[in-house]
C-alpha cells in the first residue's frame, strides 16, 4: 500500500460512495507505508465501520480476496500496467480504474471495465457505475476479456509468432 497507488483518493470519495451505495465495503489487501494513513483517514471520515485493511496476505491466497469482491478499484497513475487489473477481471470483478493510455487494450470503458477521469467527482461517478447495473453486466464477461493475458493466451501468441517466423523462413 504505497503512495503511488493513490488509495487516499479512493478513501476521500468513499463517504459519498457509501451514501449512494450503503452496502459497499472498502477492503484494502496488503501492507505498505500508507496503511496507517488510510486507517486514520477512515476514522476521520467516519467510515471505518465499512473499511477493512487486511495487512499482508500470501500471494497464493489473493484469489480468495478477489472472490469476496464485486468491484476492483485502482486510482493509480503510475502502476497502470499492473497485473492486478487482469487478475481482478479473471476473477469476475468489474474493474474501475483511472484512465491511462497504458490501459488501452486491457480496459475498454463500459465494455471490459469502467474508466474514470482524474478528479474525485469523476472517480465517484465511475464507482457508482461500477456498483450499479453496468458494473454487474461487465463483471459477467470480465473473465473473457482477461483470457488473452492468461498463461494460455500468452503461449498461443508466442506460438503464433514462431509459426509466422517459420513460415517466413520457408518462403525465403
Predicted features along the sequence, with ranges:
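A conserved mid-protein helix/loop that constitutes part of the nucleotide-sugar donor-binding site
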Residues: 2-16, 26, 33-39
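Nucleotide-activated donor-binding/catalytic signature segment of Leloir-type glycosyltransferases, i.e.
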Residues: 37-57
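Short alpha-helical donor nucleotide-sugar binding micro-motif in glycosyltransferases
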Residues: 56-57, 64-69
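Aromatic "clamp/platform" in nucleotide-sugar-dependent glycosyltransferases that forms part
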Residues: 77
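Short hydrophobic beta-strand element within catalytic cores of glycosyltransferases
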Residues: 94-97
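Conserved acidic donor-binding segment of nucleotide-sugar-dependent glycosyltransferases
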Residues: 109-120, 129-134
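A short, well-ordered alpha-helix in the C-terminal region of glycosyltransferases
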Residues: 136-149, 160
Amino acid at each position: 500500500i504505497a503512495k503511488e497507488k493513490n488509495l487516499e483518493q479512493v478513501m476521500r470519495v468513499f463517504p459519498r460512495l457509501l451514501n449512494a451505495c450503503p452496502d459497499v465495503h472498502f477492503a484494502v489487501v496488503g501492507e505498505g507505508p500508507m496503511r496507517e494513513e488510510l486507517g486514520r483517514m477512515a476514522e476521520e471520515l467516519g467510515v471505518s465501520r465499512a473499511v477493512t485493511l487486511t495487512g499482508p496476505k500470501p500471494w497464493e491466497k489473493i484469489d480468495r480476496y478477489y472472490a469476496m469482491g464485486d468491484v476492483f478499484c485502482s486510482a493509480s497513475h503510475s502502476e497502470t500496467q499492473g497485473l492486478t487489473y487482469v487478475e481482478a477481471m479473471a476473477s469476475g470483478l468489474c474493474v474501475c480504474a483511472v484512465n491511462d493510455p497504458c490501459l488501452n487494450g486491457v480496459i475498454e470503458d463500459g465494455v471490459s471495465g469502467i474508466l474514470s477521469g482524474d478528479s474525485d467527482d469523476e472517480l465517484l461517478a465511475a464507482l457508482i457505475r461500477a456498483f450499479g447495473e453496468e458494473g454487474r453486466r461487465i463483471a459477467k464477461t470480465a473473465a473473457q476479456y482477461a483470457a488473452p493475458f492468461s498463461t494460455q493466451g500468452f503461449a498461443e501468441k508466442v506460438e503464433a509468432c514462431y509459426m509466422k517466423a517459420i513460415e517466413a523462413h520457408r518462403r525465403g
